[in-house]
Regions:
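A glycine- and charged-residue-rich anion-binding loop/surface
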Residues: 1-279
Length: 279
């Protein structure tokens, strides 16, 4: 049976935290009998897609541990083991409301109306990373003509694979230019051009995409097809820091961190140095 595509509420508002939806399908997870795979009519949960890790949060009072998309249908995997997810639920609720939060669990079955809440900190940190990566990749493409041929955004690092070698000096210059763009607090634009408009548009990631193409533009720096949530202005990225780089498959692999994740990485480095120095 074919399933109707899930309505992507995160496309409409990347800053929304709570939503309501109807369960279309609820099936036991084949790998774990304490988990269920749920399909909703609409969702705020961004799935693992385009190299980015999925949103986490709460659905129907249970922890969402994975979100996947196939043929436009988004599947949420929830953990129903109370002992395993209780603390995670409370913490996610505290991040959302600022208060201690006891989620109300509901029956998980087709036809049931449920409430969902995304883990906002996780979502926003991912938005910072992805928007920073767009600016970095756009500058590399403009200056050197190289394509971003590999991208991965995890909870600990962002890696980008470029189609040509970039010297350490040039990488440092790109890093500086990205942070200049961040300091300008430029509005980031999301548009849905028609096929005719798209044919006339110069943008990165120009691959065959079925259906409506979503274009994310950082004026003066990057125009790229992208499905992920982004910050509204470059200033929200905070900062970008190159963490590592190495020659890779005839090009270069560059690792970066942005915003709060970059700050946390440098706090950890400071703590290590302080411990080694006996401070």
């Amino acid at each position: 049976m074919s399933m109707t595509e899930t309505i992507k509420l995160y496309d409409r508002d990347a800053y929304a935290i709570e939503f309501e939806a109807d369960i279309i399908s609820c099936e036991p997870n084949k790998a774990d009998d304490k988990q269920f795979d749920i399909i909703l009519n609409q969702t705020l949960f961004f799935p693992e897609e385009g190299g980015q890790s999925p949103d986490m949060g709460i659905l129907g009072g249970y922890s969402v541990v994975d979100v996947q998309i196939k043929n436009g249908v988004i599947t949420h995997t929830v953990d129903i083991s109370a002992g395993d997810c209780c603390e995670a639920e409370k913490e996610a609720g505290k991040q959302i409301t600022g208060n201690e939060f006891e989620p109300e669990k509901v029956e998980l079955a087709a036809g049931v109306h449920v409430c969902g809440k995304i883990d906002w900190q996780h979502r926003f940190y991912n938005m910072q990373q992805h928007s920073g990566e767009h600016i970095f990749s756009g500058i590399v493409h403009r200056r050197f003509g190289f394509e971003n041929v590999g991208f991965h955004l995890s909870d600990s690092v962002v890696t980008m694979d470029f189609s040509g070698v970039i010297s350490p000096e040039d990488i440092a210059e790109v890093e500086h230019e990205v942070n200049v763009a961040i300091s300008k607090n430029i509005p980031i634009e999301v548009t849905y051009p028609s096929r005719d408009e798209l044919a006339q548009l110069e943008y990165r990631s120009k691959i065959e995409i079925e259906g409506q193409v979503r274009i994310v533009t950082v004026p003066g720096y990057d125009v790229c097809a992208c499905c992920a949530p982004h910050v509204k202005r470059t200033g929200e990225i905070g900062m970008l820091k190159v963490m590592n780089y190495q020659n890779y498959k005839g090009g270069v692999r560059i690792s970066i961190l942005c915003g709060f994740r970059a700050l946390e990485a440098f706090r950890q480095k400071r703590d290590i140095i302080s411990e080694l120095m006996g401070i």
